[in-house]
Design a protein with these regions (language model features):
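Active-site neighborhoods and metal-handling regions in enzymes and metal-associated proteins
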Residues: 1-178
Length: 178
């Protein structure tokens, strides 16, 4: 990735490359996705912030997406499965009428930023890899006001909503503990 962080604005879901040509405006939402390496171990985190006063529609999107992340984290317990995490996220997002991005998902985290297993933001309870103590995963719902469908822009990095509607992204790296 050519940037130090990912900075994605409004309908940009992930992998926005920071640029001096992008001027934030009152009412925008800005997702910042960062990683860190400490003593050879990786951490990954994202948060979506309001720029000044935002519309009630965008405020609700941020609130629901953050709720999705916390519900996914709550489901990340030994003995549960990846499908339990995805189901918890999907249920909240779709109940709110939002689209759950499917092409981009959470992931295992360790010595590398993206390791197995993939951690989808959608799924069925009691399916997928069983969660065991010692696993470290990034749970990162990407939720769209409109459709879940995405498009990759011409730079080959930036991913936007296909319908141009806003998207929010919240992420935490969590360890599964006994």
């Amino acid at each position: 990735f050519p940037g130090s962080i990912c900075a994605s604005v409004n309908d940009q879901i992930v992998h926005g490359i920071p640029s001096n040509s992008v001027i934030l405006q009152e009412g925008d939402i800005l997702s910042i996705d960062t990683g860190a390496i400490v003593k050879g171990w990786v951490g990954d985190n994202a948060w979506t912030y309001p720029v000044g006063k935002i519309s009630p529609e965008k405020k609700r999107l941020l609130e629901v997406t953050e709720q999705c992340m916390w519900a996914g984290i709550d489901a990340a317990r030994p003995g549960n499965h990846l499908g339990d995490i995805g189901h918890a996220i999907q249920e909240i997002a779709e109940r709110a009428g939002y689209g759950v991005v499917r092409e981009y998902v959470g992931h295992g985290v360790g010595r590398d930023m993206h390791e197995d297993p993939n951690v989808p933001n959608y799924g069925r309870k009691h399916t997928g890899v069983k969660l065991e103590p010692g696993m470290v995963i990034a749970i990162e719902p990407m939720i769209n006001i409109g459709t879940y469908k995405t498009k990759v822009m011409s730079d080959g990095w930036l991913v936007c909503t296909r319908d141009g509607k806003p998207s929010a992204h919240f992420e935490k790296t969590v360890a599964i503990t006994a």
